[in-house]
């Protein structure tokens, strides 16, 4: 079973990297876009699909090739608010199954930014490494300056028992 998950994960990562739309087996909402016939149309993996549907329908996002709050998205996929990404991570973690863990690893390895309103970032205080990539987990901020919209790194997905909520 582990080899099967690895093959699915690698295929999904390659598809995402090349902009191909594939949907996680058993879901209609988990993948670039969706194949659902409507909001109430869910796949056989209902709980996982509900997490993805909620994430897809989050209104706090910067669509590809657009700007919001002075932030530009030059990527092929939307950049979601940090609040939306946090809800998605918590939803996946709450399922405690192999499918949600695999999706979390794939998604949070290929998507690396979110946006929020906060004090200006001065530097990164704590980093997280995953193979050859690093992300900032906590920032030193300049509280003396006005708040602004800015990008933040998304933490890599780890086993739910070690997730911070």
Predicted segments with their positions:
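Extended terminal accessory/targeting regions
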Residues: 2-165
């Amino acid at each position: 079973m582990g080899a099967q998950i690895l093959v699915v994960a690698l295929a999904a990562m390659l598809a995402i990297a090349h902009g191909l739309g594939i949907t996680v087996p058993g879901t209609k909402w988990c993948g670039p876009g969706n194949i659902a016939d409507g909001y109430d149309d869910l796949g056989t993996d209902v709980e996982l699909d509900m997490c993805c549907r909620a994430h897809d329908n989050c209104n706090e996002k910067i669509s590809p090739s657009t700007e919001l709050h002075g932030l530009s998205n030059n990527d092929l996929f939307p950049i979601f608010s940090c609040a939306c990404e946090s809800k998605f991570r918590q939803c996946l973690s709450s399922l405690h199954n192999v499918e949600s863990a695999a999706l979390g690893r794939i998604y949070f390895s290929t998507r690396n930014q979110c946006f929020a309103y906060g004090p200006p970032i001065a530097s990164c205080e704590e980093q997280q490494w995953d193979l050859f990539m690093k992300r900032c987990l906590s920032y030193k901020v300049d509280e003396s300056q006005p708040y602004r919209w800015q990008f933040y790194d998304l933490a890599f997905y780890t086993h739910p028992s070690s997730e911070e909520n």
